[in-house]
Curated annotation (Swiss-Prot):
Catalysed reaction equations from the record: L-glutamate 5-semialdehyde + phosphate + NADP(+) = L-glutamyl 5-phosphate + NADPH + H(+)
Enzyme Commission (EC) number: 1.2.1.41
Gene: proA
Location in the cell: Cytoplasm
GO cellular component, one term: cytoplasm
Broad class of enzyme this protein falls into: oxidoreductase
The species this protein was found in: Caulobacter sp. (strain K31)
GO biological process: L-proline biosynthetic process
Cross-referenced PROSITE patterns: PROA (PS01223)
One Pfam entry name: Aldedh
HAMAP family: ProA
Family stated for the protein in its record: Belongs to the gamma-glutamyl phosphate reductase family.
Gene3D superfamilies: Aldehyde Dehydrogenase, Chain A, domain 1, Aldehyde Dehydrogenase, Chain A, domain 2
PANTHER family: DELTA-1-PYRROLINE-5-CARBOXYLATE SYNTHASE, GLUTAMATE SEMIALDEHYDE DEHYDROGENASE
Protein name as annotated: Gamma-glutamyl phosphate reductase
Length: 419
């Protein structure tokens, strides 16, 4: 069978799996999620052995350090994966929920009710945990999913998927609901972008800029984009110095390879000489390289000079760009020029300044006095996330189970006819 025929058959099977999930009860979907988590734990030795193969290949292939860090699984991380599936099981089932209801003068009762999207294709790179997160969120929201991970993590993904399939079978749910592309052939991506003979309803890319750009340019079905995290922390003149140090240090250094990591520090010119030195000192002691503009280097001469490309670079490494700006307006202008619309934060004790920042910064997530590393579906109470959507339609910010639904209008009458 040709690759195109194989992929088309996968799409048709996914459509059948979506139909089965749509009519499954919330209790059945919850049971499936618990069974999936149990199977991941039971298969931990096989999954970690598969991950070791991917890591060995990554080392020989010269994969970048941030990519390797994202790829790596250990017992603790794998337990987090299983716990994440259980967290999705614990969130309220989004299907069948009435989001609005009203009665017309003619007596028609109209309700807007959440329903699954249908079949979702997930194209992602480096992160084997996405296999479990995407599967869990799609099962919770009643969607079938076709997973296509990167070749760098194919062994890990296949092992996790095998565990998920066991869990689904144990719960009486068809394995057609969660399928994985087993070949690293890039033509498989092209087939998915073509919609697999109109069986795919939504494509979600999660990876580097080039992957997302290709999907958005070539897809013949709807795309929910997850762009890079060019995130900023703006330290306002009215910031508490202690909070500023702690928030910036956490935003940058807690885990540098995640999309919620801060890549640029903006400091208010009105207080830069007071606020910047302790922040810079803390970052340097933590092993972070600072690349600053002229005004910031005048305050902290140890910084390397920033070049134009730095302001639009997602480092995913212990590196941060630093710029001095003129208040909230200057910070917002810098973010508008270089940001990705992902996550941006302000540190300030001035409520009016915070509200002005919120109004001016048009990002999916805007934080006040909190680290950008909270840009995560689990931290939002979504159980897990399938990505951070930076577009404005259909969802925005962390994409959890609720964001993977659409709606239908249910109209109940008593025999009305239209005059």
């Amino acid at each position: 069978m040709s690759l195109q025929a194989t992929m088309t058959a996968m799409g048709q099977a996914a459509r059948q799996g979506a139909s089965a999930l749509r009519v499954a009860t919330p209790a059945q979907r919850t049971a499936a999620l618990h069974a999936m988590a149990a199977a991941i734990r039971a298969d931990a030795p096989a999954i970690l052995a598969a991950n070791a193969k991917d890591l060995e290949k990554a080392g020989a292939g010269g994969l970048t350090a941030p990519m390797v860090e994202r790829l790596m699984l250990n017992p603790e991380r794998l337990e987090d994966v299983a716990a994440g599936v259980e967290a999705v099981a614990a969130i309220p089932d989004p299907l069948g929920v009435e989001t609005a209801r009203w009665t017309r003068p003619n007596g028609l009762d109209i309700a807007r009710v959440r329903t699954p999207i249908g079949v979702i294709a997930m194209i992602f790179e480096s992160r084997p945990n996405v296999t479990a997160d995407a599967a869990a969120l799609c099962v919770r929201s009643g969607n079938a999913v076709i997973l296509r991970g990167g070749s760098e993590c194919i062994h890990s993904n296949l092992a996790i998927h095998a565990a998920i399939a066991k869990g689904l079978k144990a719960a009486g749910i068809s394995s057609d609901a969660v399928q994985i592309v087993r070949t690293p052939d890039r033509d498989a991506v092209g087939a998915i972008l073509g919609g697999l003979n109109r069986t795919i309803d939504l494509i979600i890319p999660r990876g580097g800029k080039s992957l997302v750009a290709r999907v958005q340019a070539e897809a013949r079905v709807a795309v929910l984009g997850h762009l890079e995290g060019l995130n900023h922390v703006f330290v306002h003149a009215a910031a508490d110095p202690r909070k500023a140090v702690e928030i910036v240090l956490n935003a940058k250094m807690r885990r540098v390879s995640v999309c919620g990591s801060a890549e640029t520090l903006l400091v208010d010119r009105a207080a830069a000489e007071r606020l910047l030195p302790p922040i810079a000192d803390a970052l340097i002691k933590a092993g972070c390289e600072l690349r600053g503009d002229g005004p910031s280097r005048a305050i902290e001469p140890t910084m390397k000079p920033a070049v134009e490309a730095d302001w639009s670079t997602e480092y995913l490494a212990p590196v941060i760009s630093v710029a001095v700006v003129d208040g909230v307006e200057g910070a917002a202008a810098h973010i508008a020029a270089y940001g990705s619309g992902h996550t941006d934060a302000i540190v300030t004790e001035d409520v009016a300044a915070a509200e002005r920042f919120i109004a001016l910064v048009d990002s999916a997530i805007v934080l006040v006095n909190a680290s950008t590393q909270f840009a995560d579906g689990g931290e939002f109470g979504f159980g897990a996330e399938i990505g951070i959507a930076t577009d404005k339609l259909h969802a925005r910010g962390p994409v959890g189970a609720e964001q993977l639904t659409t709606f239908k209008y249910v109209v109940r009458g008593t025999g009305q006819t239209r005059p």
